[in-house]
């Protein structure tokens, strides 16, 4: 047990160090409080996430048998703060930094939910499908993302990112992400039993959200695009059968295939607005019709 005299001695030494090297102390404090933005830290966080799900927890696979059909829509949650280097001139988290946070959160979701994409040994048996018809090694590639900002995140404020599968169509799988206050999910769960009015629940949910984002992914087997529904069935996350499956880690609220499809259709209605943004690519053809107002480099007109 540390004695009081030792703590006092340690405090005096620390104070002396601060007084002797004030600028070095400030530098260390700033670095430690912004370690999230240190060089190569983004890469390290990404590699750690992939290693954890692909090596350390390789056999912890999400399947219908373990989590039920609702497991496909399960959330991945990551937590973070907004350090000094992420703040803009307005004094809150810069808009551009949301995307680097999303990268880390989504890599957790992809490597947790779609482990069977790149590893055939983690996929369930499909006796009714010929081996040559099954995708060999699928890649999950990012196709686009978009953020809708609602409220600012203050410097060093804590927040969580909740992401899940929203829907899918013939080519793309859509993921929705929410930047929310810590503990929002638990609060919503407790309020659901207390608040009966759906409009009131919607208002409460909206008040907890800082930012919402939507992302689309495509499954690739070599250069061939794999339909999301086929990819999900291949990984044991989607079943065409209405048969109720015995599950080990989900609650008693068992989902049918019809309910999954209903949830997909609800999500695709929202995703349609994101899909429409692909038409923006065609608008560049009119570039010659409008004047150029200036061209600038990294440091204005100098470079």
From Swiss-Prot:
Report which residue ranges the record marks as coiled coil: none
* Pathway terms, separated by semicolons: Secondary metabolite biosynthesis
Keyword Transferase attached: yes
What turns on expression? Expression is positively regulated by the oxaleimides biosynthesis cluster-specific transcription factor poxB.
Keywords, alphabetical: Transferase
Q: What class of enzyme is it?
A: transferase
Q: Which GO terms describe its molecular function?
A: transferase activity
- Database matches in Pfam families: 4HBT_2
For this protein, the Enzyme Commission number is: 2.3.1.-
Q: What does this protein do?
A: Thioesterase; part of the gene cluster that mediates the biosynthesis of oxaleimides, cytotoxic compounds containing an unusual disubstituted succinimide moiety. The first step of the pathway is provided by the HR-PKS poxF that serves in a new mode of collaborative biosynthesis with the PKS-NRPS poxE, by providing the olefin containing amino acid substrate via the synthesis of an ACP-bound dec-4-enoate.
The family classification in the record reads:
Belongs to the lcsJ thioesterase family.
The record, for PANTHER family, names: PROTEIN THEM6, PTHR12475
Q: What is this protein called?
A: Thioesterase poxG
């Amino acid at each position: 047990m540390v004695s009081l005299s030792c703590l006092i001695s340690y405090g005096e030494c620390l104070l002396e160090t601060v007084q002797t090297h004030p600028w070095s102390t400030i530098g260390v404090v700033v670095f430690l409080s912004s370690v999230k933005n240190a060089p190569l830290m983004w890469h390290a966080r990404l590699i750690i996430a992939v290693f954890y799900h692909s090596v350390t927890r390789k056999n912890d696979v999400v399947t219908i048998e373990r989590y039920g059909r609702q497991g496909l829509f399960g959330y991945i949650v990551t937590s973070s703060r907004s350090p000094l280097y992420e703040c803009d001139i307005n004094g809150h988290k810069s808009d551009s930094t949301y995307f680097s946070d999303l990268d880390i959160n989504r890599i957790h979701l992809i490597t947790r939910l779609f482990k069977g994409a790149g590893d055939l040994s983690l996929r369930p048996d499909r006796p009714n499908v010929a081996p040559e018809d099954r995708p060999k090694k699928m890649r999950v590639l990012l196709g686009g993302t978009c953020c809708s900002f609602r409220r600012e995140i203050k410097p060093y404020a804590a927040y969580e990112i909740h992401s899940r599968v929203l829907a899918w169509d013939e080519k793309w799988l859509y993921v929705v992400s929410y930047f929310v206050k810590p503990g929002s999910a638990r609060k919503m769960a407790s309020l659901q039993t207390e608040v009966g009015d759906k409009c009131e629940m919607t208002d409460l949910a909206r008040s907890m959200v800082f930012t919402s984002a939507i992302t689309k992914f495509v499954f690739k087997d070599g250069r061939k695009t794999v339909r999301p529904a086929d990819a999900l069935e291949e990984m044991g996350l989607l079943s065409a059968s209405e048969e109720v499956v015995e599950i080990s880690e989900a609650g008693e609220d068992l989902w049918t295939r019809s309910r999954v499809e209903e949830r997909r259709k609800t999500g695709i209605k929202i995703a349609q607005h994101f899909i429409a943004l692909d038409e923006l690519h065609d608008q560049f053809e009119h570039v010659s019709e409008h004047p150029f107002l200036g061209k600038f480099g990294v440091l204005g007109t100098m470079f």
